[in-house]
Structures are given as structure tokens and as C-alpha cells.
Amino acid sequence: MKRLGVFLILASIVCGVVAICGCTGGGGTDYSSSTASAETETCPVQILEHHLVRKDYGTVYVEGVAQNVGNKRLKFVEIKARFYDADGVLIDEFMDVHRDVDPGQKFRFKIIGPIGEEGKKVAKYDIAVGTWWTE
């Protein structure tokens, strides 16, 4: 029982640290999310461009380009998007994952969002770099 208590305390501390070390995406959004990197507080990924695409049957997605602006290879990077209706109510959030991104490397991402009726409701989105870590 004592071990469970220690585990819960440590888990709470880790979650708090991860939540504090956020990384905001480009495009002027305030969408902050967590990072798994304890080495630095500076986000090594910059979102260079992004836009919303609508397809048939209510499919929406965000595509764009990001870059590793750090000096280390990134083993894992998430680019996340949250989708909202016209009233600003969150519909859902989705992400795209990339692995082994070298320093200076640019990469394209495509975040497939809600589909069908939910996709038709999307009026706006925001985007950010999610979890990332280096070698």
C-alpha cells in the first residue's frame, strides 16, 4: 500500500512537470501542450505554415510544414490540432506523428480531423507542437 502511495505521488509530479514544460505551435495560436523533454524548455520544432482543407463527405484536415530548429535529432514529434464549431465549442482533437527528424530538417504533416457531420461543423482550428523528445 505504501508503494502505491509513493507511485501516485511520483506520477503526480511527473504529470505536473510535463504540463509545465509546454511548447506552443506557430501561426499565432495559444494552444500549448506538453513535452517529454526534460533537457530544455525551448521547443525545437517550429510550425512554418498550415491551413485547413475540406474534402467530400465532411472530411477536414490540416496540412502544413514544420521544421526541427534545434541542434539535436528528434526521435519523436507530435503536431496536434483542435477543431471547433462556429460557437467556439471544441469538436475534437487529432495529431500527426513524425520520427527521426534531423536538425534543420523540414517535414510535411497532415492531421486528419473529424469526418462526416462532425467534419461539416468545423469552423476553425488551432495547432501546436505536442510531445517531443530527442535521442
From Swiss-Prot:
Primary residence: membrane
TM segment ranges: 4-24
Membrane topology: Single-pass membrane protein
Keywords: Membrane, Transmembrane, Transmembrane helix
Superkingdom, natural source: Archaea
Protein name per the record: Uncharacterized protein MJ0360
Subcellular location: Membrane
Any one GO CC term of the record: membrane
Record-linked NCBIfam families: FxLYD_dom
Organism expressing this protein natively: Methanocaldococcus jannaschii (strain ATCC 43067 / DSM 2661 / JAL-1 / JCM 10045 / NBRC 100440)
